[in-house]
Design a protein with these regions (language model features):
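S-adenosyl-L-methionine-dependent methyltransferase catalytic core, i.e., the SAM/SAH-binding region
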Residues: 1-308
Length: 308
């Protein structure tokens, strides 16, 4: 299967990043290379772009797609480790498109989709780490309940966690169908019928986030990316659910106003200066894109500009 992935909010990303010839950019979530291709086209032959991804399949596909650009450099790794991956590099701009790619969802054997029966994997980097099967067969009931609530906004978290423990005591969960069966057994049929989306979508999202440790290092990663920007450089971040968006929004707010003095203090004595400003607010896709790309409905873009 080719690595097909429609880049969301592409026009908005280009508008806010405004890449120019000779500049240096990093795409921390390379995926199919759609955003990277547009940035490289805008910069021309003199621009440089580092495309980072945890998924070896994404690296291979994007390298093939972008080989016509002399300034493209593929980097296998996690965007959380940007300072180790690109030591000493200063960026005019950066992009993070968080979440799972269309390719990963559409490749059954990766185990991300609740629509297909496949091994319960969900690793973004298939060369390392525990699988989703490892996780759901060892996690405690209390911890699984917390993960479902915090990462999936799942109202039936306690019941799903209880059923998970019961089911795996009979037989270890091995496939995506096994995990869907847990959700089906936990949520009443009448409630499932009223659900606009698949009832297992929140559970799958929560498990994926836990397996890939997507949120715990996110705030520090955002700080590291901003630190690597040149003055006036911009970081664009696309999120797909409220938990991620909240972290991005609050981190940008802290970077814009890092002062830790008491609220009623007459003057600032902590010495912490603003690192820049958030611009544009929460940017959503327009009607035309929403009509063409269903994934764009849940996408939110936020942009931070480093101070000069």
């Amino acid at each position: 299967m080719s690595f097909h992935h429609i880049p969301v909010l592409l026009n908005e990303v280009l508008e806010y990043l405004n890449p120019q010839p000779g500049e240096v950019y990093a795409d921390g979530t390379l995926g199919g290379g759609g955003h990277s291709e547009a940035i490289l086209q805008a910069m021309g032959e003199t621009g440089t772009l580092y495309g980072i991804d945890r998924d070896p399949a994404a690296i291979a596909a994007a390298t093939e797609r972008l080989r016509v650009f002399p300034g493209f450099h593929a980097v296998h790794g996690n965007f959380h480790d940007i300072k180790e991956l690109l030591p000493g590099v200063q960026l005019n701009g950066g992009l993070l498109d968080l979440g799972v790619s269309s390719y990963q969802l559409d490749t059954p054997e990766r185990g991300f989709s609740y629509h297909e029966d496949a091994p319960l994997d969900m690793r973004m980097d298939t060369t390392q780490g525990m699988t989703a099967a490892d996780y759901v067969n060892t996690v405690s009931e209390q911890e699984f309940c917390r993960v479902l609530r915090e990462y999936g906004d799942e109202k039936w978290a306690a019941r799903i966690a209880q059923i998970l423990i019961e089911k795996r005591s009979e037989k270890p969960l091995e496939t995506t169908k096994d995990l869907v069966a847990v959700v089906d057994a936990a949520i009443p049929k009448a409630v499932r019928r009223k659900d606009e989306g698949h009832p297992a979508r929140r559970t799958f999202q929560a498990v994926r986030i836990a397996v890939n440790d997507e949120l715990a290092p996110l705030e520090q990663a955002l700080r590291d990316w901003v630190d690597m920007l040149v003055p006036g450089g911009r970081l664009a971040v696309i999120t797909f659910h409220s938990v991620e968006d909240r972290i991005v929004k609050l981190t940008f707010r802290k970077l814009q106003n890092p002062c830790t003095c008491p609220p009623k203090a007459p003057i600032c004595t902590c010495g912490k200066k603003p690192l820049g400003r958030a611009i544009g607010g929460a940017i959503k896709a327009g009607k035309e894109e929403l009509d063409e790309n269903n994934r764009a409905h849940s996408a939110t873009l936020r942009v931070f500009e480093k101070g000069t």
